[in-house]
Amino acid sequence: MPSLDYLVLTHPHADHTGNARAVLRALPVKTLLLPLWQPTADETADWPRHLAELAADSGAEILTAEAGEEFPLGSGKLQILQGGSEDADSVNDASLCTLFTAGDFRFLDTGDAEADAEQRLVDTYGPTLHATLFKAGHHGSYTSNSLTFMQAVRPEAVAVSCGLHNDYGHPHRAALQNYAEVGAEVWRTDLEGSLTFIWQNNTLNVETSADSADFAA
């Protein structure tokens, strides 16, 4: 991989940003996309130290993404559904939410957005949230992945990023039940390891690396 068009950091939690500096050092990044969010008195923004300086020094453009913006990406486009919110009740609900489309392929990523943010997305976009592949909200937490939201997304497949025997019980059985309710195939990093999804001839295929399951995040 010679370079990245975009490095998207959904929200300032270490499990979503921890290796951002390593990526910026290892690869040329054209654009760093960040959400709009300011910490309240009860929360802190856990961005990697000197992230902005490192991005600027590497030549990356730093953008605060806003809902409604679209960015070209290969033969497709990256649409910003939620660009974060200064009024969000939590940093999770301020997560950058994106929909990548290319032909008939649609990939939805909502970061750690929880039920309130999911409902706002349903109210705003309705059935146009439909995705071929959905990255499970908040690692498959019960606070996300509501049935109402999953019925709007109607994914062909769900990718759950979670560690083996993690302390949070991800993915939660309620989330798994909601995925099953809408007929989605579920792939989990704690069981299958690294997941590589390939869209070819209108068919979604996945390659796994089971030996990496113990290290999945």
Q: Can you say where each PLM-predicted feature lies in the sequence?
A:
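Non-globular, low-confidence helical/coil segments that flank catalytic cores
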Residues: 1-217
